[in-house]
């Protein structure tokens, strides 16, 4: 079952057409620090699929090399559910090593010793700022030692275990409003000529109902919500797709799955980035949906 599911995901990825004009944008289920915990750990909230060596881990292992080989990006731009700002979009700007921000608590010590090597790029950061300002979206570069949060370095450590030799730039979400984030994505579409743009979150993220994280214990409403997400993503026509994606916030289980929507709305950045093309779900694992947007038609 597990191996056939992984083969299915790989088949979906390989079916994405070879790059012609723009690199597809990726909506990525970034997972949690539990991806670094062994399946034998005592935790009963998260299934083994969400832990070290589980199905989500295996998907990320396969995804990283695929992205670099298929699209050969000159850099990676990433939005994370864990990087919010107020008033304007923040673009992390530096040329040296990206530090890491261990923004999780109560985990074993070794999870605070994880290393992931990558460098930023002030030049690419400036390109992002220019593209956003062309759309009258307030934006500024920031520096300092905040570093990449775990919504970036946890999945990227699995995807690129030896680090990256192309620049990696993190960008904030300046709002949780779906249409504003969709417009942020649209503003950056031209950068897909050279760069892979990733928008990371989770389609289920609640600490008010821990049973929701595990498919074996989750109420049927969470599973129905995920099915509606999958259908919305793969809607063919751009306007219909956008309407269905926006309509997901009216689903009876939306607020149960997201008491606060910061982990859901990165989906709208990816949708805006790929608003001019097709979209394809490449991982339908429960609670860990990932998809490409902006596939050439």
Swiss-Prot record:
Residues that bind Zn(2+): 30, 82, 205, 263
Keywords tagged on the record: Cytoplasm, Metal-binding, Nucleus, Oxidoreductase, Zinc
Known cofactor(s): Zn(2+)
Cell compartment(s), UniProt: Cytoplasm; Nucleus
Record-linked Pfam families: LigB
CDD domains: 45_DOPA_Dioxygenase (cd07363)
Co-factor binding details: Binds 1 zinc ion per subunit.
GO molecular function, one term: oxidoreductase activity, acting on single donors with incorporation of molecular oxygen, incorporation of two atoms of oxygen
GO terms for cellular component: cytosol; nucleus
Its EC number(s): 1.13.-.-
Function field: May be involved in the metabolism of aromatic compounds.
UniProt similarity note: Belongs to the DODA-type extradiol aromatic ring-opening dioxygenase family.
Stated name of the protein: 4,5-DOPA dioxygenase extradiol-like protein
Protein species of origin: Schizosaccharomyces pombe (strain 972 / ATCC 24843) (Fission yeast)
High-level lineage: Eukaryota, Fungi, Dikarya, Ascomycota, Taphrinomycotina
